[in-house]
């Protein structure tokens, strides 16, 4: 994950309070008080300064002025967007609902990152948990321009949300803002519809179809909602498979069929939502392809989430880095790792050298969305130039033996989903033999991002993070990630291997890097919660804080953790069906595998106190338990 997500700068921020939501609520204008208050900045603040309900910050660059608004009214003005600052207000919204955030922007001589309106929310620890921004950003000198975004505020969000206008520190120019609004939208009755088959293609074997309902459990009960999958068959007769929503959690309705029973080639599986009177409320279809034989060429993901390279199982174990130069690769290849993710897109010579050292490369094409500064630096100014850039890179490296995957998103929010999905689709079209991978810290949004990736990587970094979340945030976020993808997508998770002080310079005296025990514990938390790969952040970040912790020490910690994980990879990749294991103890992670007939169990204590971890194993008569030290990890064979 790119630390660029922290550096927004100028922000006009409003904080929102959230309560419960109705998924089928009318999206017409909310009869409640319009949001935000004083949206046109017409009412002056105390002593005639600023605007009532708003707090203005930022080096004296923010002011309000009558006659500068859209119709000669009042506008909020930032005289120098490059000097940053923000304006904030508290507002009230409901979690579990989608909102349209809109406003009007005028600019003069804006260069660099551009100007937009931003909306974000926080988690229970006070950290930003999700964000969205209007796209494309407003650049140059413009007349009043309406901008808008749509954002889903997850049910788990706290009562703090931000509405703002972030720009990067590299932006310059002047900007005006007027008439901001936050409007609730209607929740569609049927949400994401996917299968657990890689790219919805399979020749045989069980395939599970998953659908998310846009209804609360109360609405499911009150309206008698239920569903059915209409599945085509080899014989030409469609089958209706009843699917009842879980009364406790209707967010996943599923059905499993044998892929061999589907007609050859592409066909459509349909999900129909039915109410208690038998009336069809809504329907949605999914294109699925039954192939003539299993596809094994290149890099693919099986239905357990395990990666395969030309048919052989593979567990990605690597790190982010800045550039994969020969000097860096010489050093990195001496560790236990089998892949790397360099932000500076490698040259052919660098790819060749990585391959000669036995390393796979996740190729970075994430910074090519028009409107981002990094895209502008590459000469990308519109969506056509995005496509040209991605096409050129993919065609150049799609057949390279070092290529593992395409990295296409580094923390961009749901407001980018159409373009993220378009890039994923383009990568598949140009290169059907390698998956796309993304990094995403806004875990509550991941289900909405499903069209935009093949493999997900979420990246909780709890050690000395703002809000001081517990180290068990790794466990919590990975569980949310797994649920967000219906357990049907591979997770190459991203452990913290850096000191936050390298990115929050103002807090550097309050931060530290994770210890070896913490790095080890976080890695095993990820795996215990279902990770199919680990790509730590970041090999190159240690230089920033080497005055506190030597680079050699951080490298040693990363290698010790990596060696331990590497030693268990043959077990992770076993094709034998593993027994289901369920933690009984709160705040603990467990997972089981079966290899050569033996059952292997992983138990993790994600706390700084000793803990007895109790768990139940499918097929075992009695619950079992292991005693773990603070941050303890146990991995061993368990017998009936």
What are these regions (language model features)?
Residues 200-217, 271-276, 280-640:
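Glycan-processing catalytic domains of CAZymes
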Residues 26-252:
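Extracellular and organelle-lumenal recognition/adhesion modules and their flexible linkers in secreted
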Residues 259-265:
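Surface-exposed, short loops/turns at beta-strand junctions within beta-sandwich domains
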Residues 90-91, 259, 617:
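Hydrophobic core positions of the immunoglobulin-like beta-sandwich fold
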Residues 1-14, 23:
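Bacterial N-terminal signal peptides that target proteins for export
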Residues 14, 19-31:
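Bacterial Sec-dependent signal peptides at the C-terminal "C-region" and cleavage site
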Residues 157-158, 266, 613:
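Low-complexity, Ser/Thr/Pro-rich intrinsically disordered linker/stalk segments at domain junctions
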């Amino acid at each position: 994950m790119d630390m660029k997500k922290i550096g927004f700068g100028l922000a006009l921020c409003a904080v929102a309070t959230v309560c419960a939501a109705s998924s089928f609520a009318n999206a017409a204008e909310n009869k409640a008080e319009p949001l935000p208050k004083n949206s046109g900045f017409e009412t002056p603040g105390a002593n005639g300064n600023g605007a009532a309900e708003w707090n203005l910050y930022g080096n004296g660059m923010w002011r309000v002025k009558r006659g500068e608004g859209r119709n000669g009214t009042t506008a909020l003005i930032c005289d120098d967007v490059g000097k940053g600052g923000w304006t904030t207000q508290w507002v009230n919204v409901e979690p579990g609902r989608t909102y349209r955030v809109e406003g009007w922007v005028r600019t003069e001589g804006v260069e660099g990152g551009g100007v937009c309106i931003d909306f974000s929310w926080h988690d229970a620890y006070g950290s930003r948990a999700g964000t969205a921004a209007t796209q494309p950003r407003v650049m140059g000198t413009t007349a009043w321009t309406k901008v808008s975004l749509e954002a889903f505020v997850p049910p788990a969000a706290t009562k703090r949300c931000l509405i703002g206008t972030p720009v990067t520190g590299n932006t310059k120019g002047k900007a005006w803002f007027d008439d901001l609004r936050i409007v609730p939208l209607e929740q569609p009755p049927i949400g994401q519809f996917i299968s657990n088959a890689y790219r919805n293609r399979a020749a045989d074997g069980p395939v599970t179809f998953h659908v998310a309902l846009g209804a609360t459990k109360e609405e499911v009960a009150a309206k008698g909602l239920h569903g059915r999958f209409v599945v085509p068959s080899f014989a030409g007769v469609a089958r209706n498979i009843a699917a009842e929503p879980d009364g406790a959690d209707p967010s996943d309705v599923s059905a499993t069929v044998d892929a061999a029973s589907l007609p050859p080639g592409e066909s459509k599986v349909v999900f129909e939502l039915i109410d208690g009177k038998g009336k069809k409320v809504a329907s949605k279809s999914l294109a699925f392809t039954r192939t003539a034989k299993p596809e094994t060429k290149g890099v693919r993901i099986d239905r357990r989430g395990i990666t395969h390279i030309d048919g052989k199982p593979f567990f990605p174990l690597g790190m982010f880095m800045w550039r994969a130069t020969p000097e860096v690769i010489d050093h990195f290849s001496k560790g236990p790792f089998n892949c790397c993710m360099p932000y500076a897109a490698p040259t052919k010579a660098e790819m060749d050298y990585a391959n000669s050292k036995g390393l796979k490369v996740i190729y970075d094409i994430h910074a090519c969305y028009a409107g981002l500064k990094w895209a502008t630096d590459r000469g990308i100014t519109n969506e056509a130039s995005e496509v040209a850039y991605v096409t050129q890179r993919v065609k150049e490296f799609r057949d390279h033996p070092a290529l593992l995957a395409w990295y296409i998103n580094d923390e961009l929010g749901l407001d980018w989903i159409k373009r993220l999905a378009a890039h994923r689709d383009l990568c598949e079209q140009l290169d059907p033999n390698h998956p796309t991978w993304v990094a995403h810290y806004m875990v509550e949004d991941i289900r909405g991002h499903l069209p935009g990736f093949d493999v997900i990587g979420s990246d909780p970094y709890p050690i000395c993070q703002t809000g001081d979340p517990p180290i068990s945030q790794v466990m919590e976020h990975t569980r949310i990630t797994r649920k967000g993808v219906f357990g049907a997508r591979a997770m190459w998770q991203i452990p913290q291997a850096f000191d936050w002080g390298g990115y929050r310079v103002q807090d550097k005296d309050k931060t530290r890097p994770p210890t070896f025990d913490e790095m080890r514990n976080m890695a095993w938390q990820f795996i215990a919660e279902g990770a199919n790969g680990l790509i730590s952040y970041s090999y190159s970040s240690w230089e920033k804080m080497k005055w506190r912790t030597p680079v050699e020490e951080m490298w040693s910690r990363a290698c010790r953790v990596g060696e331990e994980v590497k030693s268990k990879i043959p077990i992770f990749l076993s094709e034998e069906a593993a027994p289901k294991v369920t933690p009984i103890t709160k705040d603990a992670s467990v997972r089981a595998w079966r290899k050569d007939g033996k059952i292997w169990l992983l138990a993790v204590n994600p706390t700084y106190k000793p803990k007895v971890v109790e768990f139940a194993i499918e097929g075992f008569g009695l619950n079992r338990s292991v005693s773990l030290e603070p941050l303890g990890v146990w991995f061993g064979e368990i017998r009936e």
